Amino acid sequence: MDANSINSFFLIGALLTAVSVLLSPMSSRLGIPILLIFLAVGILAGEDGPGGILFDDYSTAYLVSNLALAIILLDGGMRTRVASFRVALWPALSLATFGVAITTSITGMMAAWLFDLHWLQGLLVGAIVGSTDAAAVFSLLKGRSLNERVGATLEIESGSNDPMAVFLTVTLIAILANVDTEMSFSFMFISFIKQFGLGICLGLGGGWMLWKLVNLSKLADGLYSILVLSGGLIIYAASNKLGGSGILSIYLVGLFLGNKPTRGRHAILNVLDGMTWVSQIGMFLVLGLLLTPSDLVDILIPGFALAFGMILFARPVAVWISLLPFKSFSSRDRWFISWVGLRGAVPIILAVFPMMAGLPGAQLYFNLAFFVVLVSLLVQGASLTTAARLAKVELPPKPLPVSRSGVEIYPSSEWEVFVYRLSESKWCIGEPLKRLAMPDGTRIAAVFRDDTLLHPSGSTRLEAGDILCVLGQEKSLEALSNLFSQAPENKEVQRFFGDFFIETDVKLADLAPIYGLSLDNLADDMTVADLVVLQLGANPVLGDQFQWQSLHWVVAGLYEGKVTNVGIRLPTEHSL
């Protein structure tokens, strides 16, 4: 490649990236996933688009996509709270294994019938599109206030279901490439356990080693993120090299680092946030360039049938069967999880495997995977907000600070500065600072008014528009935000928790005469907390709901895993 070609490459790459960034606000206005914007830019720049760029290098696309996916999973793991595993780990693993297998089987049979394929070829198509995509799920769920059980299940599933899809895809390619070779069940089982086992061991072990290395190292501030990124990629590559799941390993590395006091954690997350955006843009641009839309014309009708068959039948069946042992999921929860079976880059990456293996019909598999991804992003991704509202899994937006940043007092410092802007509706307006019930271990470090830094004392009275800089830790964030912040207004969602609230230590016997409750066969000293456990099980989450004796009960407050208060919605005909 000469200097002119290199400059042309830089020019085109930078131009496409800039166009993708500038067009990204269109996603919210049009109600479509931002990933689809990036993909569309790549398609328009490609062979059939006005850009006319001829790109058919599957090896390069495979390299770029795997690198991008690894970075996205590392970032996603660091932002996942391990506390969510309490309610979501086993359901997510069930979806990541049995769910993928069921989706693969049903989708595979549909593909074999629709495209007149051998049943093994159909199963290969099912395996390629069988897993949800971490990049798509993390991107579309980011910033949404969903029921913790539902949101965490979807995120953990998307980060852990790729090993099953890769295992099925690689196994089926090996069978189709060597039709005379018999593969025993024990061989396939061992291969599956190896992928998961090595992926988990290397991810957790490597994550621990990387965490120790980061905290023991004394580097320039900007180098910690590079160390984490390079260390994560080393573990990702080593896991793949040894026959494990690199995708699972790097997700667990991020999970480990994100839930430990790590030196420079906030700076690392800030850098990874930018790297994740670059990865998403680069990955979907390259995949868009790889597609020739005219190749999809021949599979248009059966392709739609396959995509909607998977969305409306295969995925829901897989979800309902996989979640049968978990009674805490309501029908609405299961429906929403079924709908958010988003496909993205992973199916397209897996579709490159048959191309690189030289299998007959590989181009058809690739085109089908791309078509299913397009339909999934357009239909499921664009309707995510509506689906969350209909399923009633969207919670009121949490009050949050305007910004937050870490304070590196010592290597593993957990101190942060939270910045709040006071609105006129806050009760603390006009009150002196000494009257504020600040959480323990927090302090107002600075007050800004009209771009002027004040020297606050106990008698300083707060005014609307004041900007407060509060020193504290994440454990105090909720209390501080309730005190100073204001969640975006959404009356329909705000009514989510009910007409009024009661504490869970109240006895049902005290409520019975007020609301006409029948307490037959219930203990006289039974409390609201006991009722919640009876109805929802031992691990309720914020937003869980149940109907009991004409009243609608909603979990409205939690502290250290225990319900502190519930909201009650009265029947419309009830009057106080």
UniProtKB/Swiss-Prot annotation:
Gene Ontology CC entries for this record: plasma membrane
InterPro entries reported in the protein's UniProt record: Cation/H_exchanger_TM (IPR006153), FAD-bd_PCMH-like_sf (IPR036318), Na+/solute_symporter_sf (IPR038770), NhaP2 (IPR023729), RCK_C (IPR006037), RCK_C_sf (IPR036721), Transptr-assoc_dom (IPR005170)
Predominant place of localization: membrane
Superkingdom of the source species: Bacteria
Boundaries of every RCK C-terminal domain copy: 405-486
GO BP of this protein: cell volume homeostasis
UniProt subcellular location: Cell inner membrane
Regions crossing the membrane: 6-26, 34-54, 58-78, 87-107, 109-129, 163-183, 185-205, 219-239, 242-262, 271-291, 299-319, 335-355, 359-379
Catalysis performed (reactions): K(+)(in) + H(+)(out) = K(+)(out) + H(+)(in)
Molecular function as annotated in GO: flavin adenine dinucleotide binding; potassium:proton antiporter activity
UniProt entry keywords in alphabetical sequence: Antiport, Cell inner membrane, Cell membrane, Ion transport, Membrane, Potassium, Potassium transport, Transmembrane, Transmembrane helix, Transport
Bilayer topology annotation: Multi-pass membrane protein
Role: K(+)/H(+) antiporter that extrudes potassium in exchange for external protons and maintains the internal concentration of potassium under toxic levels.
PANTHER family for this protein: K(+)_H(+) ANTIPORTER NHAP2, NA(+)/H(+) ANTIPORTER 1
Similarity comment text for this entry: Belongs to the monovalent cation:proton antiporter 1 (CPA1) transporter (TC 2.A.36) family. NhaP2 subfamily.
Protein name: K(+)/H(+) antiporter NhaP2
Organism per entry: Shewanella baltica (strain OS195)
Lineage, broadest ranks: Bacteria, Pseudomonadati, Pseudomonadota, Gammaproteobacteria, Alteromonadales
